[in-house]
Regions:
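Hydrophobic alpha-helical connector segments
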Residues: 63, 67, 77-103
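Solvent-exposed, amphipathic alpha-helical segments
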Residues: 21-28, 71, 75-82, 160-168
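Short hydrophobic clusters on alpha-helical segments that form packing/core surfaces
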Residues: 14, 18-26, 68, 97
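Amphipathic alpha-helical segments used for helix-helix packing
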Residues: 98-122, 166
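N-terminal intrinsically disordered/low-complexity leader segments
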Residues: 1-13, 194-195
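Amphipathic alpha-helical packing segments from all-alpha helical-bundle domains
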Residues: 70-74, 117-144, 151-155, 180
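Helix-turn-helix
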Residues: 17, 25-59, 63
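Hydrophobic alpha-helical segments that form the core
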Residues: 96-99, 147-170, 174-189
Length: 195
């Protein structure tokens, strides 16, 4: 029996591979079932190689959280900073909820672990507040409401968006049409708050 020849990867590529496999395993089997040994087996590498890159399970999970957080909030802020159009802002937020739902909910899983989440320090809450403030500021500008009212409106819009994304993940259908319908539903609801 021939053993497949393993390909030697660069340090960055191997680290990315291990983080990708970790993400897949957690989403598929749950965090409690995840072990470094399972990661090694599924990644097709030795246990010592996994520990060469990540000395502990905690370090691995923190690295995964940092990567996923940076990607998620980095891409979200980039997209939001490229538009002043309120409808486009709402569309971005709804699309992000659909992306999160279809790609799995790795961020909430990892953020719920205090020892893992501490890797973000104050950056995590600051990024979340910044994104939230962009939506609140956009609502204030578009509808001429107070900050307090805009926060309520943002919460309602967010709940609608999340519910639409969760429903789509179960029922399926045309993704873009469903996103557009959710955006129109949100905009219609927000209209009721106009002065």
């Amino acid at each position: 029996m021939n053993n497949p020849i393993r390909k030697r990867l660069s340090t960055e590529a191997r680290c990315t591979q291990l983080l990708d496999v970790t993400r897949e395993l957690i989403l598929e089997h749950g965090l409690n079932s995840f072990t470094m040994e399972l990661l090694a087996r599924k990644a097709g590498v030795s246990n010592p190689l996994v520990y060469k890159y990540f000395s502990t399970r905690l370090v691995l999970l923190q690295s995964l959280l940092q990567r996923e957080f940076d990607f998620f909030y980095g891409s979200l802020l980039t997209r939001l900073n490229q538009t002043d159009d309120f409808v486009a802002v709402v569309h971005i937020f709804v699309s992000i909820n659909f992306d999160q739902e279809s790609n799995g909910k790795i961020l909430p899983i990892l953020l719920n672990l205090a020892d893992v989440a501490k890797v973000l320090g104050t950056v995590g809450p600051k990024a979340q507040n910044k994104v939230g403030n962009i939506l609140v500021d956009s609502i204030m500008k578009a509808y001429g409401v107070t900050r307090k009212q805009a926060r309520v409106m943002a919460k309602i819009a967010s709940g609608t968006s999340i519910a639409a994304a969760e429903n789509f993940s179960v029922v399926g259908g045309n993704r873009e049409q469903t996103i557009d319908s959710a955006v129109q539903f949100i905009l219609g609801g927000l209209e009721t708050f106009k002065r």
